[in-house]
Amino acid sequence: MVHATTVDVTHFPGTEPVDQLDMTATFTNNEFIELKHCEPTDSLILHGVKVSVQQGLCSATTRKSNVTIPFFTPLSPGSNLADYNGSSKEGASVDAVLRTLKRLPGTCGSYSLRVDAVNVNLAAVKRNPVAVTITLPDGSSGCLSINNALIDQ
């Protein structure tokens, strides 16, 4: 479940992918509610996360722009902060920080994610609303549509 998100899209001239995405999202893995347990394969640190941005509402069939972060590296042992600096599976240059928040009862974890990515194809994202989908390593996902994305500002 995605609770909150901010999105800042900057389009650059040239052949796609050339655009920039700056975003934050706060989300919870609610798998425990469904399965009554948390799967080890759901580790965002080990298996990363996919962020998708699209114009329209969550149910829209518009093209999604994906940034898949393959894994995160803890900043220090026991730290609730982890980062990733490198290429996404789609070839974008990514700087991302994952903060593990206090685990709420009945969930498998809550997180805050910041992603700065360049060389992303965001040509289809031209106006609000904008939908952000967070896909966990097991394929489950949550989406939130917002009406206040910053586009070319």
Features from the language model and the residues they span:
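Extracellular glycoprotein-like low-complexity segments
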Residues: 1-153
